[in-house]
Amino acid sequence: MRTYEMMFVLRPDLEEEQVLETKERLQKIIADFGGEFINAADGWGKKRLAYAIDDYVEGIYSLWYFKGKPETVDELDRIIKISENFLRHIIIRQDEK
């Protein structure tokens, strides 16, 4: 399994409960595809965006690390793209050391 870094920005108007549900859904996808959630740097919280995205000037930032197969990344990417809760996301494979 490879190690990945995933950063995503959620809509700032989401309730805390919606944010938690969205994050739990992503963790479930990682686990369902045989992956392993490593850790999250969720302390960033709500930050101002460099430019407006869909009329939002702020977003809720999260940075995650996880291990998984390429199929895990494909499914995460697919789910994030069809969800209205995400403004932006990126998933990067970490280099092996």
Curated annotation (Swiss-Prot):
InterPro entries: Ribosomal_bS6, Ribosomal_bS6_sf, Ribosomal_S6_plastid/chlpt, Transl_elong_EF1B/ribsomal_bS6. GO terms for cellular component: cytoplasm; ribonucleoprotein complex; ribosome. It holds the Pfam family Ribosomal_S6. One of its GO terms (molecular function) is structural constituent of ribosome. Keywords: Ribonucleoprotein, Ribosomal protein, RNA-binding, rRNA-binding. It comes from the Bacteria. GO terms for biological process: translation. Binds together with bS18 to 16S ribosomal RNA. Belongs to the bacterial ribosomal protein bS6 family. This is Small ribosomal subunit protein bS6. It comes from Syntrophomonas wolfei subsp. wolfei (strain DSM 2245B / Goettingen). The lineage of its organism: Bacteria, Bacillati, Bacillota, Clostridia, Eubacteriales.
